[in-house]
């Protein structure tokens, strides 16, 4: 249950961060930014943001890191709650005799034909 909740939260954070980037990019081309640059002298201007090439590189790095984190999360989710990978032998032993149930009960009654 926690795995599903974590995945939903992760997707929500990704959606919010990507929508936030679109909003900030649309504001960069706004005439308001041009008016602010004209009104403030060079000394009082805030430091400029990195150019678009650096933004693209940082976005690629963030996506790569996110991919690594997602892969780790999926590996942990597969392992289960105890941190050990599931044992295929144990899973098959749980249902070893279920197919023989009908045959054994039929042998007990020994129907005559």
Swiss-Prot record:
Function: Cholecystokinin-22: hypotensive neuropeptide that binds cholecystokinin receptor type A receptor (CCKAR).
Similarity annotation: Belongs to the gastrin/cholecystokinin family.
Phenylalanine amide found at: 101
Pfam families per UniProt: Gastrin
GO cellular component annotations of the record: axon; extracellular space
Alphabetized SMART domains for the sequence: GASTRIN
Gene Ontology biological process: digestion; regulation of blood pressure
Lineage of the species this protein comes from: Eukaryota, Metazoa, Chordata, Craniata, Vertebrata
Region of interest: Disordered: 77-97
Database matches in InterPro entries: CCK-like (IPR015499), Gastrin/CCK (IPR001651), Gastrin/cholecystokinin_CS (IPR013152)
Protein's UniProt name: Cholecystoxin
């Amino acid at each position: 249950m926690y795995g599903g909740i974590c995945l939903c939260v992760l997707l929500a954070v990704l959606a919010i961060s990507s929508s936030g980037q679109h909003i900030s990019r649309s504001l960069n081309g706004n005439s308001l930014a041009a008016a602010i640059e004209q009104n403030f002298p060079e000394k009082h201007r805030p430091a400029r943001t990195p150019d678009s090439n650096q933004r693209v590189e940082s976005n690629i790095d963030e996506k790569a890191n996110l991919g690594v984190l997602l892969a780790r999360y999926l590996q942990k989710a597969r392992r289960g709650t105890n941190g050990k990978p599931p044992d295929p032998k144990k899973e098959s032993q749980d249902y070893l005799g279920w197919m023989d149930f009908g045959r054994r009960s039929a042998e007990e009654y020994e129907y005559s034909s």
